[in-house]
Amino acid sequence: LTNLAFRSTAASEGTGFLLANGYYLSNSTAAAHGLGPLASRIQNEIISKFREMRLDRTELALLKAIILFNPGQAIDAIYATDLSTEGRRRLDVWRDDLYGSLHAYCTAVHSLGSARFTKLLLRLAPLRSISMKCLEHLVYTKLAAE
């Protein structure tokens, strides 16, 4: 979802999505396939904010790493049983390092670095929420097809 949003910042505002294979998916096509509300949320809550902030590739990479090492409560419960105490400690250290790296990058590159860091972190909640909705849609579509 983060890559889709980042690529789509290059498209005309609010018109659609640039897919990984280079194709363009218009909002009308997304709506015709039952993705209208989801597409609208992606446009309004993620793509427009990334475009407004002029998100760069370094920030994108750090956000993706933060998402990877901070997967959420359901996944954390799995990690808690699968990881050793040392493994959990290392994961926590890596999370802290990633947040610190993003903050350091924002303050080094942007005049209002701390504010930008905060704005970037505020994108994590919508990214997680929309990702879960995408997953629900995929599961529902698969179940409906069977």
For every predicted segment, state its role:
Residues 1-146:
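Nuclear receptor C-terminal ligand-binding domain
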